[in-house]
């Protein structure tokens, strides 16, 4: 599929997303950079075209659930602004830009250096899953060890990475790929199931909480 056709297909389905924008909560998501250290740090990369740092769907949903379960203990940090969540970057060799990967890698390293006692959990949605894969596999073993769990919604590198993150323990990762979500099969064809992951955010949050010490 040519890049122009990829962009048109992704843009059309983004507009046609069945999730009502009025029901979504847009949060700041810059709490690692701007706030005090917390016992838990959640780092998330949003889907293509989503505004803000956490986005307006699965990112805020997981963040809010973690905060409800561990009141006062969670800092939520979205990847940006160098990660722009633009559509064309989906067609790059790693499914996102090198700038986005480097920014996410830097956030993980910042969490460890700034807050050495924090437990890190992470996630991504759509293009954001490629950001997480690219960043986490490049981290040192010491930083990777601080990451307790990762959830990936509509994993765009699922087929290429065989359902896991390269160079990272498989038991720390939970992948959510809906039936009929063709990006999980290694394509850039975005079908309606790709927008179904809000219903998985409760289970994903429970998984991350279960990974904490």
UniProtKB/Swiss-Prot annotation:
The keyword Cell division does not apply. GO terms for biological process: carbohydrate catabolic process; lipid catabolic process. The record marks 48, 127 as: Transition state stabilizer. Disulfide bonds join 37-115, 63-76, 177-184. Keywords: Disulfide bond, Hydrolase, Secreted, Serine esterase, Signal. Its EC number is 3.1.1.74. GO terms for molecular function: cutinase activity. Optimum pH is 9.0. It comes from the Eukaryota. Competitively inhibited by the carboxylic acids butyric acid, valeric acid and hexanoic acid. Competitively inhibited by the dicarboxylic acid succinic acid. Competitively inhibited by the alcohols propan-1-ol, butan-1-ol, hexan-1-ol, octan-1-ol, and butane-1,4-diol. It is found in: Secreted. Pfam families: Cutinase. Interacts with hadrophobin rolA in a pH-dependent manner. This is Cutinase 1. The lineage of its organism: Eukaryota, Fungi, Dikarya, Ascomycota, Pezizomycotina.
